[in-house]
Amino acid sequence: VGLLLKEGARASNITKIITELNDRLLRKILEIAERKFGKPPVAYCWVAFGSEGRKEQTFKTDQDNALIFADPETAEQEDAAGRYFAEFTAFVRESLLRCGFPPCPADYMASNARWRQPLRVWKKYLASWVSTPMPEALMHAVTFFDFRPVYGEAALAEELRTSLIGLLRDQKVFLGHMANLVVKNTPPIGFFKSFVVEKDGAHKDELNLKVKGIAPLVDIIRLFALERGVRETSTLERITALRGAHTIVQEYADEFENAFEFIMLLRIHHQYEQISDGRTPDNFINPNELSNLEKRSIKDAFQLITKAQDLIIERYKSMIW
């Protein structure tokens, strides 16, 4: 990664390489698990979500995964699948932990019985979240809707994606609730284009690039992708797919791409320097340590986020509170 940074590689190329390496490691662990526990009773697909699902991983990442398995034909087969995948996913979780991937703090992992289910149950989950967009359902939606098949029967994940696209067709109420979430996370820039930083604590005078920079862009583009039934999960691939299909993206596609690439690259540089110094990587930077060009570029990115959020408020004005 250090060599790629020196050569001026784009952030998206670096995150793709990191994701590919992580995917290969995960697939190897899953192959070992299959040898250890034998052939599964039914076909399954291991899916990643969050930054892993979007292929946007940096150095600091935890386990965000789930398991979809084919609908069992009998009660006996369902029991066998339940027992098999309980042991299987526990082994994978511990193996990933030993390889340096900590468990998800919110327990969004296949080792949690709630997140390893047959396809029919997953379809019910999605239908429930979309039809009743309460806060918990929206939290699950934001987490899971970036799911990507990593190993196994990818057709199971593709069928679930098709089901989700169908559920969201003309679902203005759910999309309105999602829009409401999207516009609440405003970028850290004040009225006079000054940075809004942490006022106290361990990160005093710093700002969180992930929460206040990357996340708003990811959320904005995800909303637009859900509006148009886009199958892609990565932010940049979604922007490409939306260029000819969404009026806001048509107008600001290049700006969205540049803003995302810039903030992500700033984050990767920051984390690489921390690791090189023997420190734990985080997402906090002190804007006073940025060059004038970097300050200008990040302010432009934050202003773009504000502009997009204003357009979303206009689009969903009766549903924003």
Model-derived features: where do they sit?
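A nucleotide- and high-energy phosphate-metabolite-utilizing enzyme signature
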Residues: 1-321
